[in-house]
Amino acid sequence: MANNNLWTDSYWLLLMQACKKKPDDVKSPWSKTMVDLAIELHIHPKTLFEKMEQLLDHKTASLQKIWDTYADNPRRLNKDAKRVREMKGFGDADSFFMGVESIDSFETFYLPVADDTKLTPASLTILIDLYFMLTPNTMVEETPEVADVARMLTLTTKEVVEVLAIFQTFDPILKRKALPTSALVEAARKVWDEYANDTQNMNDKKERALAYYHK
């Protein structure tokens, strides 16, 4: 869990901004809105979720003032939130990562596995779940489930099929020839090793990933 000492009161404006995104409500801690802000601030989504609940309750005088000032004034909110983001040192990863490993693992779940791809451990988690739902002869671009997942992850059907083909090389039943080593192959191997014999873990992580990619 994130250290609360990374939190500053100026971040209330960024939370208010996230809160006012449609629909106006407490976002799931794993929604794209919350995760992207958590990565930006280097604060765990669950911590931000707790803060957002406090903001919505606005039971303290300071939070009530923020609510009165910005809740119905989106122009001022966006202007002042932009100023917060422009502050010197905002989102400074170097100062954040010193001695903090647990948040690194949360962030990397949503970050690309290589510079030349937008695939992430989160999207690979959804794709390995798809893999176990299909048979090899249905792991093709024409399969509706392939198209649906591609659309959700903003990938091409070709990219989805390529990842499914990588997973096939790890499947001991299929005995496919190994592919040349690459960052994507290694990331897919890591996902396979984590989930292939741990369905509960895969389902838990899949739900988290789906919350992020849900439109």
Regions inferred by a protein language model and the residue ranges of each:
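Intrinsically disordered, charged low-complexity linkers and terminal tails
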Residues: M1-K215
